[in-house]
Amino acid sequence: YETAGTCGDTVNKSPHVPVTPEQIADSAIEAAKAGAAIVHCHVRDLDTGAQSRDPDLYKELTDRIRSSDTDVVLNLTGGTGADLTLGGIENPLPLSEEGTDMAGATERMRHVRECLPEIATIDMGTMNFGEGDYIMTNSTSQLDEIARQFQDLPVQPELECFDTGHLWYAKNQEERGLFEGKTMNAQLCMGVPWGAPDDMNTLMAMVNNVPLHWHKSAFSIGRRQLEYVAAAALVGANIRVGLEDNLYLSKGVKATNAQLVERATVILEGMNLNVMGPDEVRDMLAVSYTHLTLPTTPYV
Protein backbone atom coordinates (compact mmCIF):
# COMPACT_ATOMS: atom_id res chain seq x y z
CA TYR A 1 0.00 0.00 0.00
CA GLU A 2 0.95 3.64 -0.44
CA THR A 3 1.03 6.29 2.28
CA ALA A 4 1.14 9.96 1.34
CA GLY A 5 3.05 12.12 3.83
CA THR A 6 1.23 15.31 3.01
CA CYS A 7 3.20 18.03 4.78
CA GLY A 8 6.28 18.37 6.92
CA ASP A 9 8.41 21.39 7.79
CA THR A 10 9.04 22.88 4.36
CA VAL A 11 6.34 25.49 3.94
CA ASN A 12 8.65 28.17 2.50
CA LYS A 13 10.34 25.91 -0.04
CA SER A 14 7.47 25.05 -2.37
CA PRO A 15 4.13 26.66 -3.26
CA HIS A 16 2.56 23.19 -3.28
CA VAL A 17 3.08 22.55 0.44
CA PRO A 18 -0.33 22.96 2.14
CA VAL A 19 -0.68 25.13 5.26
CA THR A 20 -4.30 25.53 6.37
CA PRO A 21 -6.49 22.58 7.39
CA GLU A 22 -8.51 23.11 4.22
CA GLN A 23 -5.38 23.04 2.04
CA ILE A 24 -3.97 19.99 3.83
CA ALA A 25 -7.28 18.14 3.53
CA ASP A 26 -7.62 19.02 -0.16
CA SER A 27 -4.06 17.85 -0.84
CA ALA A 28 -4.67 14.64 1.11
CA ILE A 29 -7.87 13.94 -0.81
CA GLU A 30 -6.12 14.49 -4.13
CA ALA A 31 -3.37 12.09 -3.02
CA ALA A 32 -6.03 9.52 -2.14
CA LYS A 33 -7.65 9.92 -5.53
CA ALA A 34 -4.22 9.33 -7.07
CA GLY A 35 -3.87 6.00 -5.27
CA ALA A 36 -2.76 6.58 -1.68
CA ALA A 37 -4.61 4.28 0.71
CA ILE A 38 -3.32 6.21 3.75
CA VAL A 39 -2.73 9.92 4.26
CA HIS A 40 -0.32 10.93 7.02
CA CYS A 41 -0.97 14.49 8.19
CA HIS A 42 0.45 17.21 10.41
CA VAL A 43 -1.11 20.64 10.91
CA ARG A 44 0.51 24.07 10.82
CA ASP A 45 0.24 27.33 12.69
CA LEU A 46 -1.92 29.55 10.50
CA ASP A 47 0.24 32.64 11.11
CA THR A 48 3.77 31.25 10.93
CA GLY A 49 3.35 28.02 8.96
CA ALA A 50 5.33 26.18 11.63
CA GLN A 51 4.26 22.77 12.87
CA SER A 52 1.42 22.95 15.39
CA ARG A 53 -0.30 20.59 17.83
CA ASP A 54 -3.47 22.70 18.11
CA PRO A 55 -6.31 20.15 18.54
CA ASP A 56 -8.81 22.50 16.88
CA LEU A 57 -6.74 22.50 13.68
CA TYR A 58 -6.56 18.71 13.79
CA LYS A 59 -10.31 18.50 14.34
CA GLU A 60 -11.01 20.68 11.30
CA LEU A 61 -8.57 18.68 9.19
CA THR A 62 -10.13 15.39 10.29
CA ASP A 63 -13.67 16.60 9.64
CA ARG A 64 -12.78 17.88 6.19
CA ILE A 65 -11.20 14.59 5.13
CA ARG A 66 -14.01 12.48 6.56
CA SER A 67 -16.76 14.61 5.06
CA SER A 68 -15.31 14.23 1.56
CA ASP A 69 -16.60 11.61 -0.85
CA THR A 70 -13.12 10.06 -1.14
CA ASP A 71 -12.33 7.08 1.06
CA VAL A 72 -8.89 7.07 2.68
CA VAL A 73 -7.31 5.83 5.91
CA LEU A 74 -6.40 8.76 8.15
CA ASN A 75 -3.02 8.72 9.90
CA LEU A 76 -2.21 11.65 12.22
CA THR A 77 1.24 12.41 13.56
CA GLY A 78 1.93 11.81 17.22
CA GLY A 79 5.37 13.35 16.98
CA THR A 80 4.62 16.88 18.14
CA GLY A 81 5.67 18.14 21.56
CA ALA A 82 9.11 16.52 21.35
CA ASP A 83 11.16 19.46 20.08
CA LEU A 84 14.16 20.52 22.17
CA THR A 85 16.63 23.18 21.05
CA LEU A 86 19.69 23.85 23.17
CA GLY A 87 20.79 27.41 23.90
CA GLY A 88 24.07 27.17 22.01
CA ILE A 89 27.43 25.43 21.83
CA GLU A 90 28.91 26.99 24.97
CA ASN A 91 25.66 27.73 26.81
CA PRO A 92 23.23 24.88 26.19
CA LEU A 93 21.06 26.04 29.10
CA PRO A 94 18.66 27.70 29.25
CA LEU A 95 17.00 26.11 26.25
CA SER A 96 16.23 28.23 23.22
CA GLU A 97 12.57 29.27 23.18
CA GLU A 98 12.68 29.26 19.40
CA GLY A 99 12.35 25.69 18.26
CA THR A 100 11.57 24.19 21.67
CA ASP A 101 8.13 22.66 22.21
CA MET A 102 8.05 19.98 24.88
CA ALA A 103 4.79 18.48 26.14
CA GLY A 104 3.75 15.60 28.36
CA ALA A 105 2.48 12.30 27.01
CA THR A 106 -1.19 13.09 27.68
CA GLU A 107 -0.95 16.48 25.97
CA ARG A 108 0.88 14.97 23.01
CA MET A 109 -1.94 12.46 22.60
CA ARG A 110 -4.76 14.97 23.00
CA HIS A 111 -5.55 15.40 19.29
CA VAL A 112 -5.41 11.62 18.82
CA ARG A 113 -7.99 11.10 21.58
CA GLU A 114 -10.25 13.85 20.23
CA CYS A 115 -10.01 13.04 16.51
CA LEU A 116 -9.65 9.23 16.71
CA PRO A 117 -7.78 8.71 13.44
CA GLU A 118 -7.48 5.16 12.29
CA ILE A 119 -3.68 5.33 12.73
CA ALA A 120 -1.35 7.64 14.65
CA THR A 121 2.43 7.67 14.65
CA ILE A 122 4.93 7.39 17.49
CA ASP A 123 8.54 8.52 16.96
CA MET A 124 10.35 5.70 18.71
CA GLY A 125 13.39 7.47 20.11
CA THR A 126 15.61 10.49 20.55
CA MET A 127 18.07 11.68 17.89
CA ASN A 128 20.07 14.60 16.59
CA PHE A 129 17.65 15.64 13.87
CA GLY A 130 19.30 17.73 11.17
CA GLU A 131 21.81 20.43 12.01
CA GLY A 132 22.50 22.79 14.89
CA ASP A 133 21.22 22.44 18.44
CA TYR A 134 17.86 20.75 17.74
CA ILE A 135 17.15 17.34 19.27
CA MET A 136 14.05 15.20 18.66
CA THR A 137 13.37 14.11 22.23
CA ASN A 138 11.38 11.01 23.16
CA SER A 139 12.30 9.52 26.53
CA THR A 140 11.63 5.85 27.18
CA SER A 141 9.29 6.73 30.05
CA GLN A 142 7.22 8.96 27.78
CA LEU A 143 7.18 6.38 25.00
CA ASP A 144 5.92 3.78 27.46
CA GLU A 145 3.10 6.05 28.63
CA ILE A 146 2.10 6.90 25.06
CA ALA A 147 1.96 3.18 24.27
CA ARG A 148 -0.28 2.62 27.30
CA GLN A 149 -2.62 5.38 26.15
CA PHE A 150 -2.95 3.73 22.75
CA GLN A 151 -4.39 0.67 24.51
CA ASP A 152 -7.38 2.76 25.59
CA LEU A 153 -8.08 4.01 22.05
CA PRO A 154 -9.48 2.39 18.88
CA VAL A 155 -6.40 3.70 17.04
CA GLN A 156 -3.55 1.62 15.64
CA PRO A 157 0.03 2.82 16.25
CA GLU A 158 2.57 3.29 13.49
CA LEU A 159 6.03 2.99 15.01
CA GLU A 160 8.39 5.42 13.27
CA CYS A 161 11.92 4.04 13.57
CA PHE A 162 14.70 6.39 12.46
CA ASP A 163 17.50 4.09 13.59
CA THR A 164 18.17 0.54 14.74
CA GLY A 165 17.84 1.45 18.41
CA HIS A 166 14.35 2.81 17.81
CA LEU A 167 13.28 -0.51 16.34
CA TRP A 168 14.97 -2.33 19.22
CA TYR A 169 12.98 -0.32 21.75
CA ALA A 170 9.69 -0.86 19.91
CA LYS A 171 10.33 -4.61 20.09
CA ASN A 172 11.10 -4.28 23.79
CA GLN A 173 7.80 -2.49 24.36
CA GLU A 174 5.90 -5.26 22.61
CA GLU A 175 7.71 -7.88 24.71
CA ARG A 176 6.55 -6.05 27.85
CA GLY A 177 2.93 -6.10 26.66
CA LEU A 178 2.60 -2.37 26.04
CA PHE A 179 1.00 -2.90 22.63
CA GLU A 180 -1.29 -5.76 23.62
CA GLY A 181 -4.16 -6.05 21.15
CA LYS A 182 -2.55 -3.72 18.64
CA THR A 183 -1.30 -4.43 15.13
CA MET A 184 2.47 -3.97 15.08
CA ASN A 185 3.42 -1.75 12.17
CA ALA A 186 6.90 -0.24 11.72
CA GLN A 187 7.73 2.69 9.49
CA LEU A 188 11.45 2.58 8.64
CA CYS A 189 12.49 6.21 8.20
CA MET A 190 15.72 6.08 6.21
CA GLY A 191 18.17 8.80 5.24
CA VAL A 192 16.97 11.36 7.80
CA PRO A 193 20.02 13.13 9.29
CA TRP A 194 21.29 11.80 11.67
CA GLY A 195 19.50 8.52 11.96
CA ALA A 196 19.89 5.44 9.79
CA PRO A 197 21.48 6.17 6.39
CA ASP A 198 19.54 4.99 3.39
CA ASP A 199 22.11 2.66 1.84
CA MET A 200 20.85 -0.83 1.13
CA ASN A 201 23.06 -2.46 3.79
CA THR A 202 21.45 -0.37 6.51
CA LEU A 203 17.96 -0.85 5.08
CA MET A 204 18.47 -4.61 5.14
CA ALA A 205 19.74 -4.42 8.72
CA MET A 206 16.52 -2.66 9.67
CA VAL A 207 14.28 -4.97 7.64
CA ASN A 208 15.95 -8.11 8.99
CA ASN A 209 15.23 -6.97 12.54
CA VAL A 210 11.51 -6.36 12.00
CA PRO A 211 9.64 -9.33 13.53
CA LEU A 212 7.92 -11.54 10.99
CA HIS A 213 4.45 -10.88 12.45
CA TRP A 214 4.85 -7.10 12.08
CA HIS A 215 3.86 -5.04 9.07
CA LYS A 216 6.45 -2.62 7.72
CA SER A 217 6.91 0.32 5.41
CA ALA A 218 10.07 2.16 4.39
CA PHE A 219 10.90 5.50 2.82
CA SER A 220 13.76 7.87 2.21
CA ILE A 221 13.84 11.61 1.69
CA GLY A 222 14.71 14.10 -1.01
CA ARG A 223 15.86 12.76 -4.35
CA ARG A 224 16.01 9.22 -2.93
CA GLN A 225 12.28 9.15 -2.18
CA LEU A 226 11.15 7.75 -5.52
CA GLU A 227 14.09 5.33 -5.68
CA TYR A 228 12.94 4.00 -2.34
CA VAL A 229 9.53 3.11 -3.74
CA ALA A 230 11.27 0.32 -5.64
CA ALA A 231 13.73 -0.43 -2.83
CA ALA A 232 11.00 -0.79 -0.22
CA ALA A 233 8.91 -2.98 -2.48
CA LEU A 234 11.88 -5.24 -3.20
CA VAL A 235 12.42 -5.92 0.52
CA GLY A 236 8.73 -6.61 1.13
CA ALA A 237 7.82 -3.26 2.65
CA ASN A 238 5.00 -0.86 1.90
CA ILE A 239 5.90 2.60 0.64
CA ARG A 240 5.53 6.27 1.50
CA VAL A 241 5.90 9.34 -0.69
CA GLY A 242 4.79 12.94 -0.37
CA LEU A 243 5.80 16.50 0.34
CA GLU A 244 6.70 15.78 3.95
CA ASP A 245 9.88 14.12 2.73
CA ASN A 246 10.51 15.39 -0.81
CA LEU A 247 9.45 18.41 -2.85
CA TYR A 248 10.47 17.35 -6.36
CA LEU A 249 9.08 15.09 -9.07
CA SER A 250 12.35 15.36 -10.99
CA LYS A 251 15.32 17.73 -10.98
CA GLY A 252 13.98 21.29 -10.79
CA VAL A 253 10.33 20.20 -11.10
CA LYS A 254 8.37 20.79 -7.91
CA ALA A 255 5.70 18.20 -7.21
CA THR A 256 2.29 17.97 -5.64
CA ASN A 257 1.37 15.14 -3.30
CA ALA A 258 -0.87 13.64 -5.96
CA GLN A 259 1.91 13.69 -8.56
CA LEU A 260 4.28 11.85 -6.23
CA VAL A 261 1.63 9.22 -5.51
CA GLU A 262 0.92 8.83 -9.22
CA ARG A 263 4.63 8.33 -9.92
CA ALA A 264 4.90 5.79 -7.11
CA THR A 265 1.95 3.88 -8.54
CA VAL A 266 3.64 3.74 -11.95
CA ILE A 267 6.79 2.34 -10.32
CA LEU A 268 4.88 -0.31 -8.36
CA GLU A 269 2.70 -1.36 -11.26
CA GLY A 270 5.82 -1.55 -13.43
CA MET A 271 7.09 -4.12 -10.93
CA ASN A 272 3.84 -6.10 -11.40
CA LEU A 273 2.66 -5.25 -7.90
CA ASN A 274 -0.94 -4.56 -6.98
CA VAL A 275 -1.57 -1.33 -5.06
CA MET A 276 -3.97 -1.84 -2.15
CA GLY A 277 -7.00 0.34 -1.51
CA PRO A 278 -8.12 1.75 1.85
CA ASP A 279 -10.51 -1.08 2.74
CA GLU A 280 -7.83 -3.68 2.02
CA VAL A 281 -5.44 -1.77 4.28
CA ARG A 282 -8.06 -1.58 7.03
CA ASP A 283 -8.48 -5.34 6.88
CA MET A 284 -4.73 -6.00 6.87
CA LEU A 285 -3.91 -3.65 9.76
CA ALA A 286 -7.05 -4.57 11.72
CA VAL A 287 -8.01 -0.90 11.77
CA SER A 288 -11.18 -0.19 13.70
CA TYR A 289 -13.42 2.19 11.82
CA THR A 290 -16.70 1.57 13.64
CA HIS A 291 -15.92 4.60 15.82
CA LEU A 292 -15.74 6.99 12.90
CA THR A 293 -18.33 9.74 12.75
CA LEU A 294 -18.86 12.36 10.11
CA PRO A 295 -19.16 16.04 11.02
CA THR A 296 -22.74 17.22 11.29
CA THR A 297 -22.13 19.97 8.74
CA PRO A 298 -19.84 18.92 5.87
CA TYR A 299 -17.27 21.49 4.79
CA VAL A 300 -17.86 22.97 1.37
Pin down the residues of each PLM region.
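N-terminal small/glycine-rich loop or linker at the start of catalytic domains
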Residues: 1-16, 86-91, 121-129
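Flexible, glycine/charged-enriched surface loops at secondary-structure junctions
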Residues: 37-38, 72, 160, 271-280
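Glycine-rich, proline-tolerant flexible connector loops at the mouths of alpha/beta enzymes
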Residues: 38-58, 190, 248-249
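Alpha-helix-loop-beta-strand connector modules within alpha/beta enzyme cores
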Residues: 51-76, 146, 150, 206-211, ...
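Catalytic alpha/beta core domains of metabolic enzymes, predominantly
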Residues: 119-242
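C-terminal helical cap(s) of enzyme catalytic domains, especially alpha/beta-barrels
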Residues: 251-268
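Mid-to-C-terminal alpha-helical segments outside catalytic/metal-binding sites
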Residues: 263-292
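Single conserved hydrophobic/aromatic residue that forms the stacking wall/gate
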Residues: 291-300
